[in-house]
């Protein structure tokens, strides 16, 4: 800590505690008498800048009081602040690095999922083709089964008793010789006998009929 004194007349505050001291905006310490002389010119007697000053006492703002505090305390604060900010930067960098790692991991997983999707799509295409082949195979065998059933049903009709009797009759008729068949003259005489018989029966039925 330095000794507070006037930068113009070098008067010390400890030797003249009753004399007020001021801190100018240009960072100069001026005692009350020197400030009174310079206030007429409204310029700092040391650097010539516009004179604006605040009295040095316990009521001055913290931003002004820090100029009169022990610099070691500020050095410790600076170290703490520097360490805190360095830790925060390191944490931020670590978080960014982990985000990059997570991004790379997500990228690898996405590539794996894309490959898996391509494989699954290929399997789907193969399964669809296999299903189509199975449907064709099933349709072919169903048609073959229907044709077999139709053939069996047609064969059963040929083996019925009526069909057998008609078949045997046609075979026996076709096997007769021409000599066994009646001649045309015999058929005509048989027809004449039948007609005469019908006439006689009709005449006997109408004997007692009168108009």
UniProtKB/Swiss-Prot annotation:
GO terms for biological process: homologous chromosome pairing at meiosis; positive regulation of meiotic DNA double-strand break formation; reciprocal meiotic recombination. It is found in: Chromosome. One of its GO terms (cellular component) is synaptonemal complex. GO terms for molecular function: SUMO transferase activity; zinc ion binding. InterPro entries: Zip3/RNF212-like, Znf_RING, Znf_RING/FYVE/PHD, Znf_RING_CS. The keyword Acetylation does not apply. It comes from the Eukaryota. Residues 172-184 have a biased composition (Low complexity). Disulfide bonds: none annotated. Keywords: Chromosome, Chromosome partition, Meiosis, Metal-binding, Zinc, Zinc-finger. Residues 153-165 have a biased composition (Basic and acidic residues). It holds the Pfam family zf-RING_5. Its main location: nucleus. Residues 149-211 are annotated as: Disordered. A zinc finger (RING-type) spans 6-47. Expressed in nurse cell and pro-oocytes (at protein level). Required for the formation of DNA double-strand breaks (DSBs) together with nenya and vilya during the meiotic recombination process. Plays a role in DSBs processing into crossovers. Plays a redundant role with nenya in chromosome segregation during female meiosis. May interact with itself, with nenya and vilya through its RING-type zinc finger. Nenya, narya and vilya contain a RING-type zinc finger domain and are named after the Three Rings of Power given by the elves of Eregion in J.R.R. Tolkien's books. This is RING finger protein narya. The gene is narya.
């Amino acid at each position: 800590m330095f000794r507070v004194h006037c930068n113009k007349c070098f008067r010390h505050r400890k030797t003249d505690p009753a004399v007020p001291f001021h801190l100018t905006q240009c960072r100069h310490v001026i005692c009350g008498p020197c400030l009174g002389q310079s206030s007429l010119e409204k310029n700092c007697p040391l650097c010539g800048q516009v004179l604006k000053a605040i009295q040095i006492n316990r009521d001055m703002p913290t931003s002004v009081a820090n100029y009169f505090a022990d610099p070691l305390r500020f050095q410790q604060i600076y170290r703490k602040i520097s360490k805190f900010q360095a830790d925060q930067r390191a944490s931020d960098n670590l978080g960014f690095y982990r985000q990059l790692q997570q991004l790379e991991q997500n990228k690898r997983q996405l590539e794996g999922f894309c490959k898996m999707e391509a494989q699954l799509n290929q399997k789907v295409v193969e399964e669809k083709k296999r299903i189509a082949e199975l449907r064709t195979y099933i349709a072919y065998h169903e048609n073959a089964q229907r044709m077999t059933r139709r053939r069996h049903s047609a064969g059963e009709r040929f083996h019925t008793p009526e069909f057998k009797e008609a078949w045997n009759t046609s075979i026996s008729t076709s096997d007769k010789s021409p000599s066994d068949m009646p001649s045309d003259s015999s058929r005509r005489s048989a027809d004449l006998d039948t007609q005469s018989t019908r006439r006689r029966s009709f005449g006997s039925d109408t004997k007692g009929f009168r108009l």
